Amino acid sequence: ASFAEAPPGNPKAGEKIFKTKCNQCHTVDKGAGHKQGPNLNGLFGRQSGTTAGYSYSAANKNMAVNWEEKTLYDYLLNPKKYIPGTKMVFPGLKKPQDRADLIAYLKQSTA
């Protein structure tokens, strides 16, 4: 199912998902350093593999994904299938509602 068919996202629910599943490796705080994964501030509209100061895999740089709701929705289903060779070890969020909620939170928190 594509993002066009996704349920409406709830940013509050997405924040809980971020804190339990993403926060260990990522931050959304402007000006914060990178963790194991890159800082996600300014994520929307950015190309994959381009955050200054973070060492990305060649796969992530070469894929040149433009991060928007649609691409994140597909990526978060199965990151290793979407970008083979990515360093992200997260297996993905299988439930469409979880992905929609997380994207709604990221849209708010990374702007």
UniProtKB/Swiss-Prot annotation:
Pfam families: Cytochrom_C (PF00034)
Modified residues (N6,N6,N6-trimethyllysine): K80, K94
A molecular function (GO) term: electron transfer activity
Positions carrying N-acetylalanine: A1
Disulphide connectivity of cysteines: none
Principal subcellular localization: mitochondrion
SUPFAM superfamilies xrefs: Cytochrome c (SSF46626)
Posttranslational mods: Binds 1 heme c group covalently per subunit.
Keyword Nucleotide-binding (UniProt): no
Residues at which heme c binds: C22, C25, H26, M88
Recorded GO CC terms: mitochondrial intermembrane space
Keywords attached to this entry: Acetylation, Electron transport, Heme, Iron, Metal-binding, Methylation, Mitochondrion, Respiratory chain, Transport
Sequence similarity: Belongs to the cytochrome c family.
Role description: Electron carrier protein. The oxidized form of the cytochrome c heme group can accept an electron from the heme group of the cytochrome c1 subunit of cytochrome reductase. Cytochrome c then transfers this electron to the cytochrome oxidase complex, the final protein carrier in the mitochondrial electron-transport chain.
Classification via PANTHER family: CYTOCHROME C (PTHR11961)
Name the UniProt record assigns to this protein: Cytochrome c
Organism: Sambucus nigra
